[in-house]
Amino acid sequence: MSIIQNRKAFHDYFIEEKLEAGLVLEGWEVKAIRAGRVQLKESYVDWKNGAFWLIGCHITPLQSASTHVKPDPVRPRKLLMSQAEINRFIGKVERAGYTMMALDLHYTKGNVKAEVGLAKGKKLHDKRDTEKDREWQREKQRVMKNQRGAA
């Protein structure tokens, strides 16, 4: 079950490969995510200190959060991946033009997981081509539906 999706990532990037990774979260963050108070729009994944980190993911703390904990809504969150997955993605990220994006957050067996994708940026003409293709697919579906109804 998906909690939130990063639709902007699919609009601005070609997603070439996907991977599910765990997240290191604090208790108030899990409660806020379950309440749907999370935003992935400006988030990306960065390589630091031998691990991948989710940067820019905004988790708004609940009003009922504990007073002795100082919540930081945009703190970097460590991604939990196997060493083989890390090695495979490091080689691809170090190539020119590739980046890693958080595509969505979802539950797997009660745990919050992030779907991370290896992405390459789209140019303006690529975005236009994608929009034309979507529009054409919609038009085809509309015509097929009308023809089925008329027959």
From Swiss-Prot:
The keyword Nucleotide-binding does not apply. Belongs to the SmpB family. Transmembrane segments: none annotated. It is found in: Cytoplasm. This is SsrA-binding protein. Required for rescue of stalled ribosomes mediated by trans-translation. Binds to transfer-messenger RNA (tmRNA), required for stable association of tmRNA with ribosomes. tmRNA and SmpB together mimic tRNA shape, replacing the anticodon stem-loop with SmpB. tmRNA is encoded by the ssrA gene; the 2 termini fold to resemble tRNA(Ala) and it encodes a 'tag peptide', a short internal open reading frame. During trans-translation Ala-aminoacylated tmRNA acts like a tRNA, entering the A-site of stalled ribosomes, displacing the stalled mRNA. Coiled coil: none annotated. Keywords: Cytoplasm, RNA-binding. GO terms for cellular component: cytosol. One of its GO terms (molecular function) is RNA binding. Residues 121-151 are annotated as: Disordered. Residues 126-142 have a biased composition (Basic and acidic residues). GO terms for biological process: trans-translation.
